[in-house]
């Protein structure tokens, strides 16, 4: 955990795929933005840092294990966190789930008082953990995560139910048990029931609000 006197405070939200991380992050961002303004708080998804696969064929890209730490460009994310905390802007990568690689575009992100960083593998990397001012693990039962993942990937990412189920059985569940669940030990706060846990969200809001004082 880092010194809270840094210019940019980084709050990490980790947990299984479809556990409710993004919902908690977006709820905190929306409600805190109403209090402090858009210039003081932002959200960065770890998904933006999947490695560039433009040099691979589509056949090779779709075989990528997206739930293994090696699929992430954590070195770039680590560099970007350091830049934000030192007051420098970053160019956030844009990842396409349809093309299974980065796009040529980036999003310009200015340092904020608080940045909420959310993703499945955040707490598996000691470099990233050391840049977080505090961290949250969203602890949602895997059967609920699976139902949410099917709905999301079919409706929003254009995938078939069979492909979602095959990926879940082959990589998502095994990688959760091997990497993501063990990383829960590094979280400062564990939130059960995901984005439906209003009491937990209010507690997190109160904690993050301290950084604006």
Curated annotation (Swiss-Prot):
GO terms for biological process: CTP salvage; UMP salvage. InterPro entries: P-loop_NTPase, PRK/URK, Uridine_kinase, Uridine_kinase-like. Belongs to the uridine kinase family. GO terms for molecular function: ATP binding; cytidine kinase activity; uridine kinase activity. It comes from Klebsiella pneumoniae subsp. pneumoniae (strain ATCC 700721 / MGH 78578). It is an enzyme of class 2 (transferase). This is Uridine kinase. Keywords: ATP-binding, Cytoplasm, Kinase, Nucleotide-binding, Transferase. ATP binds at residues 15-22. The keyword Kinase applies. It comes from the Bacteria. Its main location: cytoplasm.
